[in-house]
Curated annotation (Swiss-Prot):
Pfam families: SPOUT_MTase
Enzyme Commission number(s): 2.1.1.177
Subcellular localization, as worded in the UniProt entry: Cytoplasm
UniProt name for this protein: Ribosomal RNA large subunit methyltransferase H
Family per record: Belongs to the RNA methyltransferase RlmH family.
Protein keywords: Cytoplasm, Methyltransferase, rRNA processing, S-adenosyl-L-methionine, Transferase
HAMAP family (UniProt xref): 23SrRNA_methyltr_H
Single annotated GO MF: rRNA (pseudouridine-N3-)-methyltransferase activity
Known role: Specifically methylates the pseudouridine at position 1915 (m3Psi1915) in 23S rRNA.
Species of origin: Protochlamydia amoebophila (strain UWE25)
Length: 140
């Protein structure tokens, strides 16, 4: 089974966001084992990623992708990274330069979101990507 780690700063405080995140996590459960870790700060994210081979960081300077391009990108990352993939969401101060230099940078939008909203958008796009790759009706 494919394993996805989502690392981010701070926990989700709003129940409705957590419920929505959990719904997508439940939908993905058949294909993906998702582990979420909440860091105190961005430097803890750096510590947690020291031994990771393939890291994707969400960053405003990263490459913007359509949902279809994200699905293709996501699929290629699995091929490159094996059965484990790590996606990192920084806090308000952004990500440490050292982490950004050793990662693939993508952006979900030109807009700025809280890290809590970003987690929800990210997991929905991951779900959408899996559905695009299966050619399901979800994306149509």
């Amino acid at each position: 089974m494919l394993k996805l780690r989502i690392l981010s700063v701070g926990k989700t405080k709003e129940k409705w966001l957590e419920d929505a995140f959990n719904e997508y996590q439940k939908r993905l459960k058949a294909n993906l084992q998702i582990e979420c870790l909440w860091a105190k700060d961005s430097y803890q994210l750096l510590e947690w990623t020291q031994k990771e081979s393939l890291i994707i960081c969400l960053d405003p300077t990263g490459r913007l992708l359509t949902s279809e391009a994200f699905a293709t990108f996501f699929s290629k990352c699995w091929e490159q990274g094996g059965s484990r993939l790590t996606i990192v969401i920084g806090g308000a101060e952004g990500l440490p330069l050292e982490l950004k230099q050793h990662s693939i940078l993508i952006s979900l939008s030109l807009l700025t979101f809280t890290h809590q909203i970003t987690r929800l958008i990210l997991i929905e796009q991951i779900y959408r990507a899996t559905e695009i790759l299966k050619n399901s009706q979800y994306h149509k």
